[in-house]
Amino acid sequence: LEHCPFGVSEATSHPLSVEELTVYLLRDKSVYQLSGGGVTFSGGDPIIHISELFPLLEKLKEEQIHCTIETTLYCKDSAILLESVSYINEWIVDLKFQKENYREDYDDVMTFNLRLLRNLGVNISFRLVFVESMEADEIVERLKKLGVLSLEVLKCHALAESKYTKLGLPFRHYVPSTKSYLDFITALLMAGVDVKELAL
């Protein structure tokens, strides 16, 4: 679409070929090399369409660009997941422990894929968005079952509220109180989890 049919927002993207996107990303190659950075693929969840990224990932690998993916690991095609390992240097696993995001088979699928990646010795870190409905004891138990010793935590925010308002849609507030957030962080630390707090 050239523009939003509801007149709510303007176009913020345009299609690029793999070649065009590669050229665009390689403009910062010297910065990547100096900083130890690279290219990160994230949100929604790029693992859902990872095969479509293979041509781009292959070109970035040829250029020795460090590639990171942020994903829930909710992928039922383990063959595709295994194929992607050769292109991805770092995996950020976005843990979906919010009750509002519950899927009956999420734990099984994610745990299976996590085991696959660990067996291959890939670099994995874990991230969690904290919302008010989360119970610290329950989260700690789930982290223990997954063998998560270190966790990046982001406090839920309400940045999307204005977008919902423009669309005339109800906005559900998940932003936790400062007390519940600090209590959660304390519970993680007391359980021996190495916590890194993320800020926007």
Question: Would you name each region that the model predicts?
Answer:
Residues 179-200:
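A C-terminal junction/extension of Radical SAM enzymes
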Residues 1-14:
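Iron-sulfur cluster-binding cysteine motifs and their immediate structural context
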Residues 15, 137, 178:
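Electropositive phosphate-/nucleotide-binding environments in soluble metabolic enzymes
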Residues 22, 26-166:
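Conserved AdoMet/S-adenosylmethionine-binding subsite of the radical SAM
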Residues 99-105, 171-182:
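A short acidic, glycine-rich active-site loop
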